[in-house]
Amino acid sequence: MGDTWAQLPWPGPPHSALLLVFFLLAAGVMHSDAGTSCPVLCTCRNQVVDCSNQRLFSVPPDLPMDTRNLSLAHNRIAAVPPGYLTCYMELRVLDLRNNSLMELPPGLFLHAKRLAHLDLSYNNLSHVPADMFREAHGLVHIDLSHNPWLRRVHPQAFQGLVHLRDLDLSYGGLAFLSLEALEGLPGLVTLQIGGNPWVCGCTMEPLLKWLRNRIQRCTADSQLAECRGPPEVEGAPLFSLTEESFKACHLTLTLDDYLFIAFVGFVVSIASVATNFLLGITANCCHRWSKANEEEEI
């Protein structure tokens, strides 16, 4: 009897039980990997990494490689290291609003070819350099609003962003914006430029003319865009200016104007010669009169 039991095969676990064990082990490994790849103070779920409102002074060093949506909003981040986005090829949304950024490193978006939405509002950016968004050709929305120190946008800052639809430059420190910075954006639909200290001189005319020609396609916050100068148009709505407002920028001289200038020049020349002649005669007479008086005294 003992030998009979020894020869019988030991019953193995059911097939379904093996599958259950394998599933639990795999789930544990996946959970462990996800846990180690999610930065401290951040939450990671469904390719969304949320590190907002954590009082961070620097960006988290490691993110899940498949991150699509990254929020670093409402922190105290002052700088983003060069090449920070190099490994995150799936990134679609980057939210850096309400931080302390003064500038971004060159080539930050060089590998962010799928980035579509970028929020840099409420920072301390002072300028937008040339090729800042180089290779980020998928950008659809850029928010640069509420950067009070933003004084300059390079004419080639948005070069190559053919898919850009929404651009917010409101509430900055811009007094001038080059037409070249915008005319290379064929897909632009919404442009926000209100709340800036615009100087509505002759250099502003090309931009205004371009906006008027695109008014059906480009919505601008006309109620908030006002002129800060020159004094004669201070406080005037930017879009209330007409071609008549820039008439002085296109003053041209006619033939009659040139003839009048030539005539005035001729008269001034004759008057100058006559004046010099009279002064010479007067000086000569005074000299002779003085000499005659000296001879009489002798």
Swiss-Prot record:
* Segments forming domain LRRCT: 196-251
UniProt protein name? Leucine-rich repeat-containing protein 55
Q: Where are the LRR repeats?
A: 66-87, 90-111, 114-135, 138-160, 163-186
User: What is one GO biological process annotated to this record?
Assistant: monoatomic ion transmembrane transport
Domain (LRRNT): give its ranges.
35-65
Subunit comment for this entry?
Interacts with KCNMA1.
Q: Which gene encodes it?
A: Lrrc55
Q: Which GO terms describe its cellular component?
A: plasma membrane
